[in-house]
Amino acid sequence: MNRIYYIGGSPCAGKSTTAEILSKKYDLYYFKVDDFLDGYQEKAALKGRPICRKITEMSSEQIWMRDPVLQCEEEFLFYQEVFEYALADLKQLPCKNGIITEGAAYVPQLMKQAGIPDSRYMAITPTEEFQISHFRKRKFVPYVLEGCRDKEKAFENWMGRDVLFAKEVRKQCRQYQYYSIINDGSLGIDELVSRTAVHFGFCD
């Protein structure tokens, strides 16, 4: 049985960078769940999962002009619908030293339901200010919002969704007693990696 280490949280918190560094340092297989979400969404839509089917049929305008509260609620429902596919893929990965995987898909409630112990899961979320300032620098943002008539409002809604998502993740971590780090930008990547390594029990 593979040893799998999960990093959940919300976007723009440092999850990917942390996982990449740890995968190289400890020779772990790195599984970035975001790279597979489109495929999972297609599978779930074909199975009639309502949120995945709905999103598949929506335009960028329809997706990003929704109220942030609704976007956040449906984001959690989306991850519920695709979660099984991520777990199935992880079971198929061979790796002698273990697997480190990260993504917002690893929602605390879903991890608890799947029986993932607190020693194998943690979440990293950003503060609102850190999230928005860094998201504005990301090159893919214009492509995601392509097709939206009011791109600034669409971006505002997107950020609102992720702020709400991060708050709910932190709430669930407290509820299920999972380790959680809040990144406000003052935490250097070395410190973030170090705290994650200590939590997972990695040894130099």
What positions do the PLM features span?
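Hydrophobic anchor at the beta1->P-loop junction of P-loop NTPases
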Residues: 7
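Short beta-strand-centered segment that lines the nucleotide-binding/catalytic pocket of NTP-utilizing
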Residues: 28-44
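ATP-binding Walker
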Residues: 12-13
